[in-house]
Amino acid sequence: MKTVRGIVESTGFFTAEEIEVAVELVDAGLSGESISDYLFLFCEDVSGKVLGYTCYGRIPCTLGSFDLYWIAVHSDHQGLSIGKKLLVKTEEKIRNMGGISVYIETSSRDLYKPTQGFYLNAGYHEEATLKDYYSPGDSKIIYVKHLS
């Protein structure tokens, strides 16, 4: 999907491999292919242009735990609270599906400091860090928010 590719490329955060994964997930999800339980939420402007999206889903073999796999807003539209609104609406959908907790993973690299702050400001807390997970010096940080 060109729209999702444009969004994730514009952020400057994702590798070529990650961009391909994002596009494949949305393509498969929207075509009706069975690819587990990936769900999507898109934010559009009044003309129908997609400005950002989330990809989330129930974590298999858990009771009420969900992963937020992707959240991205086109760089032309960042700073307008679109990401915050997408996150809040995604949490609402998760809560309505019986969700209890939302988990988010991100990189420890300096590039991701704004992302880490975004999650903290949204009420998530750091649950764990997996040292050198992505590569030497690039750890995985896992955030969680317990929904009420």
Give the label of every model feature segment.
Residues 1-69, 74-76, 84-89, 93, ...:
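Acetyl-CoA-dependent GNAT
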Residues 26, 112, 136-138:
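Short secondary-structure boundary/hinge segments and terminal tails
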Residues 60-63, 110-111, 133-135:
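Short glycine/serine/proline-enriched coil/turn segments at secondary-structure junctions
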Residues 72, 108-110:
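Active-site-proximal loop/turn and secondary-structure-junction residues that shape catalytic pockets
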Residues 81:
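Conserved G/P- and acidic residue-centered "switch" motifs that form tight phosphate/ATP-binding loops
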Residues 94-107:
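Conserved GNAT acetyl-CoA-binding A-motif
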Residues 105-108, 120-141:
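Conserved catalytic-core motifs of GNAT/GCN5-like acyltransferases
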Residues 115:
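Helix-turn-helix
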